[in-house]
Amino acid sequence: MRLDDKKLMTWAKRQHDIAAANGWHGAMASNAHMLALIVTEVAEIIEADRKERRYDASVFEKYKAQMGDDYGFVCFYDAEVKHTIDEEFADVCLRLLDLAWDCHHEDMRWFDDNISIPTYCRTTTEKAWHLIDKELGWGVFQIARCIAFMYLWAEQEHIDLDFHIENKLRYNALMSKEKKIKS
């Protein structure tokens, strides 16, 4: 597995800009606060897995033409993607990318460091706990390992993580615009 440095940095900046525009970087946004938000997203992976909420890619292909505009995309996303394990994987990665940009900006380096998921991690809960207990932190090395771990875990779960990160970024940006229109 090889992480795409340029793509990850682009996403990190995009996510950080969206988060800042939405006011998600207020006075409470310390590193500890951001790590706690990542932990809550990891918990949502466990919840989605427990409820067996998975994204069905065939539905996307079926309705792709009908959701060409932003409104159609948001409706589709809300109905078919929200609260799936696939979306929660993207949410964890986006929180990690936001933390990476917040802490390290352009100095962030992405590497996979030959990461593996330990053999004792057989269930979703065990993998989630390993991520939180053994990998998570705000250092360059820790964030990079967490992203690599998420890609490896997504691969095991047959989740197209790039697809879900791109779509969640689009959704977040559209929700940001909608929020501004309503206020």
Mark where each language-model region is.
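Flexible "arm" and connector segments at domain edges
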Residues: 1-183
